[in-house]
Amino acid sequence: MRGNKMTETNLMSYNTFTFKTEAQMLLYIRLWEEKGKLLFAKLKQKGCTRFCYNQIWNKKGTYKTSTLFEYNSPQAYKDCQKAIDNFRQSIMKELEAISPVIESSRNVILQDLY
């Protein structure tokens, strides 16, 4: 529930990407800037209701970004994974050069106030 209204979203995945250098992080940010809208357009057709790419700024001396995906059902989450895997494969050469450490979590939204 958001505020007093039910939303379409009930599942979320959150991924944190940690980079060794600022240059690696900036390259990865550029990849998302170039390709993120296209990926979301594909995911939206499969039930992804929200995509957000963020830079984590409160950890001094570290280089981190994160992604947030929200889905309208468990099936939408499953359906989106193929598109996400295809996206990952399309940038694999860049990923190997950047080599981020990825930490993933999958969440059920219990309360979301705004």
Predicted regions and their residues:
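Short, Lys/Arg-enriched N-terminal segments with co-localized hydrophobic residues
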Residues: M1-K5
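Short coil/turn motifs at beta-sheet boundaries
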Residues: E8-N10, K60-T62
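Active-site-flanking beta-strand signature of metal-NTP-handling nucleotidyl enzymes
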Residues: N10-T18, S66
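Beta-strand elements of well-folded, non-transmembrane domains
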Residues: F17-T21, S73
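An amphipathic, aromatic/His-enriched active-site/gating alpha helix that lines ligand/cofactor pockets
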Residues: E34-R50, K60-G61, L68-V108, Y114
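Short, solvent-exposed loop/turn elements at beta->coil junctions and helix N-caps
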Residues: Y53-W57
